Amino acid sequence: MRLVVIAIGRLKQGPERELADRYRGRFDDIGRKLGFRGFDVHEIPESRARDAKQRIREEAAAILALAPEGAVLVALDEKGKNIDSAAFADHLGRWRDESVTSTVFAVGGADGLSPELRRKARLSVAFGAATWPHQIVRVMLLEQIYRAATILAGHPYHRG
């Protein structure tokens, strides 16, 4: 299974980019051994539309255009479920074992994700009740993907 993160906005050079790259690299090392075929990250520029609803629609269309056909869609959304790392790993492991070809993680911009995109998501995940900057959400997501791989591999990184 291929993992794809599609995020609105760009991570500039700095500590967030360094952490994101570190977790992605760590995943690459362990992910291949677990049957994951790759890990792509796509950054989409924020919409310039003046109206928030229009921005959300344009950003959702851009996310869906990059999502491979038949992919499982996971929305990172403040209204999503709070799941623990083991449950997150269970989802990834199950989809891999079901021969899902791709899992797409959608990270919205400042205005969030469109209702249409949220409806299409098989899973909607929140990292707590707080609202997080998209740069931090991206780092947290990449860490959780790496942590999920270590859980699936029985690696001691996750001690929960």
Curated annotation (Swiss-Prot):
Keywords: Cytoplasm, Methyltransferase, rRNA processing, S-adenosyl-L-methionine, Transferase. Gene3D superfamilies: 3.40.1280.10. Signal peptide: none annotated. InterPro entries: Alpha/beta_knot_MTases (IPR029028), RlmH-like (IPR003742), tRNA_m1G_MTases_N (IPR029026). Its EC number is 2.1.1.177. GO terms for molecular function: rRNA (pseudouridine-N3-)-methyltransferase activity. It catalyses: pseudouridine(1915) in 23S rRNA + S-adenosyl-L-methionine = N(3)-methylpseudouridine(1915) in 23S rRNA + S-adenosyl-L-homocysteine + H(+). S-adenosyl-L-methionine binds at residues 76, 108. It is an enzyme of class 2 (transferase). One of its GO terms (cellular component) is cytoplasm. It is found in: Cytoplasm. NCBIfam families: PRK00103.2-3, PRK00103.2-5. Specifically methylates the pseudouridine at position 1915 (m3Psi1915) in 23S rRNA. PANTHER family: METHYLTRANSFERASE (PTHR33603), RIBOSOMAL RNA LARGE SUBUNIT METHYLTRANSFERASE H (PTHR33603:SF1). Homodimer. Belongs to the RNA methyltransferase RlmH family. This is Ribosomal RNA large subunit methyltransferase H. The gene is rlmH.
